[in-house]
């Protein structure tokens, strides 16, 4: 049996870090939404063997236990004593190490797909609980749509989708270590976004307020260390984006744009100096088990 599943990227419309917890994780409060930039995950059952095989044409995708999709398959096999293998083919469209949860989305898609392939009968809530053991963003990626994420990111409260608009993304040719960004974050010196106000703006579909309220506390670290990220932000604003923000720990920057003509201007302007530029829409729907 063979299954093909989309694994969409996410952006953070608002990201706040509240404090460092005794368990070493950071308590966060953030609004995330999925966008129409997605990897493709293909699962092929291997009933005659017990292996997990990762295949990808992208040389930056690990084919062993470092891969979150591999970890998702291994977790299901061990939890439910599955005695058959699976080949996981990953076609990458989401940039790697970009702050867009590409690896987490691959893991979430693998959980959803293997739930069907192996006929486990798990609910999305049960899959999200398993996903949280793999990574903080995996639980959100199991559900998709738009949500308020709290705890270390694994406590998911769905909220309505934002009003439709274009999302233009640009990633500079650098990688950013999420762990290093958190290590260098000085919470007493940063400006904290109003996440609750963002939720209310989304609930009343107030595009102008959403644009005013975007905020990411991690910018305080990444923009200082990587001036190319700050440069992309400046250029995106100059070209006319309605709101501009770094996603996650970076380095990808996104702009929200309401009108087609302005989106084209921003997209074309960024293509002049940045190789990885995308123009996509937000995804309104949460994932289903069908």
UniProtKB/Swiss-Prot annotation:
- Please name the InterPro entries in this protein's record: GHMP_kinase_C_dom (IPR013750), GHMP_kinase_C_sf (IPR036554), GHMP_kinase_N_dom (IPR006204), IspE (IPR004424), Ribosomal_Su5_D2-typ_SF (IPR020568), Ribsml_uS5_D2-typ_fold_subgr (IPR014721)
Q: What Gene3D superfamilies does the record point to? A: 3.30.230.10, GHMP kinase, C-terminal domain
Q: Which reaction does it catalyse?
A: 4-CDP-2-C-methyl-D-erythritol + ATP = 4-CDP-2-C-methyl-D-erythritol 2-phosphate + ADP + H(+)
Catalytic residues (UniProt):
10, 137
Keywords linked to the UniProt accession: ATP-binding, Isoprene biosynthesis, Kinase, Nucleotide-binding, Transferase
EC number, UniProt record: 2.7.1.148
Specify the superkingdom: Bacteria
Enzyme class at the top of the EC tree = transferase
| Pfam families recorded | GHMP_kinases_C (PF08544), GHMP_kinases_N (PF00288)
Pathway listed for it? Isoprenoid biosynthesis; isopentenyl diphosphate biosynthesis via DXP pathway; isopentenyl diphosphate from 1-deoxy-D-xylulose 5-phosphate: step 3/6
| GO BP annotation list | isopentenyl diphosphate biosynthetic process, methylerythritol 4-phosphate pathway; terpenoid biosynthetic process
Ligand binding (ATP): 95-105
Q: What are the recorded GO MF terms, alphabetically?
A: 4-(cytidine 5'-diphospho)-2-C-methyl-D-erythritol kinase activity; ATP binding
Record carries keyword Ubl conjugation: no
**PANTHER family for the chain:** 4-DIPHOSPHOCYTIDYL-2-C-METHYL-D-ERYTHRITOL KINASE, CHLOROPLASTIC
* Family according to the record: Belongs to the GHMP kinase family. IspE subfamily.
The UniProt function text for this chain reads: Catalyzes the phosphorylation of the position 2 hydroxy group of 4-diphosphocytidyl-2C-methyl-D-erythritol.
Name recorded for this polypeptide: 4-diphosphocytidyl-2-C-methyl-D-erythritol kinase
Q: Which gene encodes it?
A: ispE
């Amino acid at each position: 049996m063979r299954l093909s599943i989309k694994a969409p990227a996410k952006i953070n419309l608002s990201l706040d870090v509240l404090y460092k917890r005794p368990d070493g994780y950071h308590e966060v409060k953030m609004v995330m939404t999925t966008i129409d930039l997605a990897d493709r995950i293909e699962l092929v059952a291997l009933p005659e063997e017990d292996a997990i095989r990762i295949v990808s044409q992208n040389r930056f995708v690990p084919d062993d236990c470092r891969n979150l999709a591999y970890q998702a398959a291994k977790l299901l096999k061990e939890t439910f004593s599955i005695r058959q293998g699976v080949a996981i083919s990953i076609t990458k469209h989401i940039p790697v190490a970009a702050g867009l949860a590409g690896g987490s989305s691959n893991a979430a898609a693998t959980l959803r797909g293997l739930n069907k392939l192996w006929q486990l009968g798990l609910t999305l809530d049960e899959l999200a609980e398993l996903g949280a053991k793999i990574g903080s963003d995996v639980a959100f990626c199991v559900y998709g749509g738009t949500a308020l994420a709290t705890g270390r990111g694994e406590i998911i409260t769905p909220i309505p989708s934002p009003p439709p608009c274009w999302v233009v993304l640009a990633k500079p040719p650098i990688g950013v270590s999420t762990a290093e960004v958190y290590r260098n974050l000085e919470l007493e010196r940063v400006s904290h976004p109003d996440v609750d106000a963002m939720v209310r703006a989304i609930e009343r579909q107030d595009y102008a307020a959403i644009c005013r309220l975007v905020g990411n506390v991690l910018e305080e670290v990444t923009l200082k260390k990587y001036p190319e990220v700050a440069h992309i932000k400046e250029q995106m604003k100059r070209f006319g984006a309605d709101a501009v923000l770094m996603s996650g720990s970076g380095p990808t920057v996104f702009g929200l744009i309401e009108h087609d003509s302005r989106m084209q201007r921003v997209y074309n302007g960024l293509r002049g100096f940045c190789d990885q530029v995308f123009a996509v829409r937000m995804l309104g729907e949460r994932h289903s088990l069908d």
